[in-house]
């Protein structure tokens, strides 16, 4: 597998306060990787390091020359007094001049929203549009920061199914920040549990047995995951 990004001994601190300590891992091609951890664990900071938005105080980051990254932020703020349609929003990207908007919207099942105004979209619809925009440069790494925030339960299920479908069709890696442990169990190839340092990492089955993971998330969640049953007959490949 291709190593898209490798982090080695990453340390980040702000005003003398440690945010991330001794972070080392590689993001490999064609996988779904989920980043979990409590509030204040440094997840958003780690995402910014991966995206190159902030530089670590210590450590090395190695990026494959073949890497192409798409990013869906946790929230998007825009001025409601400046109405903008989905089509115009998609065309704001500087990455490509000639964009087949309809084709990309069809990929995320949002073609009916092409001429809708952003401020009229539901939470789930907005996430699909952000996802479509992240796909504009055909990324081999897609970074999704809490993609189901503000989305109702049915919308979350649809969005997770879409994410898995995109991974399969595009053969890209997807790094997701998520609190949904059931999704982690069902769809993820690799889990990184963060609490300013990497508490544990590995397959979901391995991570969920880790004592530090249990101390963070509590036995209640572990019992819920223990009764999780696959509703299919295939074998996960890691």
Swiss-Prot record:
InterPro entries assigned: AAA+_ATPase (IPR003593), ABC_transporter-like_ATP-bd (IPR003439), ABC_transporter-like_CS (IPR017871), Metal_Ion_Import_ABC (IPR050153), P-loop_NTPase (IPR027417)
Gene Ontology cellular component list: plasma membrane
Protein EC: 7.2.2.20
Secretion signal span: none
Compartment list: Cell inner membrane
GO molecular function, one term: ATP hydrolysis activity
Entry superkingdom: Bacteria
Entry membrane topology: Peripheral membrane protein
Gene3D superfamilies (UniProt xref): P-loop containing nucleotide triphosphate hydrolases
Keyword Membrane annotated: yes
UniProt record similarity statement: Belongs to the ABC transporter superfamily. Zinc importer (TC 3.A.1.15.5) family.
Annotated function: Part of the ABC transporter complex ZnuABC involved in zinc import. Responsible for energy coupling to the transport system.
Binding partners and assembly: The complex is composed of two ATP-binding proteins (ZnuC), two transmembrane proteins (ZnuB) and a solute-binding protein (ZnuA).
Alphabetized PANTHER family for the sequence: METAL TRANSPORT SYSTEM ATP-BINDING PROTEIN TM_0124-RELATED (PTHR42734), ZINC IMPORT ATP-BINDING PROTEIN ZNUC (PTHR42734:SF9)
Protein name: Zinc import ATP-binding protein ZnuC
UniProt source species: Buchnera aphidicola subsp. Schizaphis graminum (strain Sg)
